[in-house]
Amino acid sequence: MPDFAWILRMAFRDFRKNISRLLLFVSSIVVGIAALVAISSFGENLTSDIDNQAKELLGADLVLENNKPIGDQPIDSMALNTASEVNFASMVAFPATGASRLTQVRALEGDFPFYGYLETIPASGDADFRAGGKKALVEKILMAQFDAQVGDIIKVGEVEFEIAGELQSVPGQTGITATVAPAVYIPMAYLEETGLVQYGSRVEYNRYFVFAENTDIDLLIEPFEDEW
């Protein structure tokens, strides 16, 4: 039968002789575990931050783009909200001065962006634009170039719009894009009336989606990837 007393005495003696090595070993294990936990936590936080920033850049959880009109989609009923945009390059004019310039016209319908916001001067410009009527939001570069003011008229195709606000920033739009072809937002309801979208026009159609928090977007769209 084992002599447990002797075993304990030997173990205690070895422990006293090698206590510094044992403490170093235990400390290494503790530090290693702590490092693994910290790295794992950092990775999760980094992934979360990247996802959040991507949403801020897109202004939505998911964006579908096509050069043809995007009809009803299977995922429409799964989304909390959707918005649509039609954008294309076109000349716009300022009737007060007769000046004109190439711009990126964006006809918007819905509450896009779902993340971030359209920053305007005055701050009420976005709300005024969405309240209805022939209102437009005009990028600051364009406003400065033609010394335009909020309340002035801008002509897009055959329709005249009152400038409701000066656009300062838009989710997903770079400074280069704004310099080459500054954006002019108009309500989708008046797009057809402008007469600018005709057969053969180079037009891009966007559909924006926002889903419930923690929705796995990749898993959600997987069954429809071949269709898109």
Which residue ranges define each predicted feature?
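Membrane transport/envelope proteins' first extracytoplasmic loop
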Residues: P2-W228
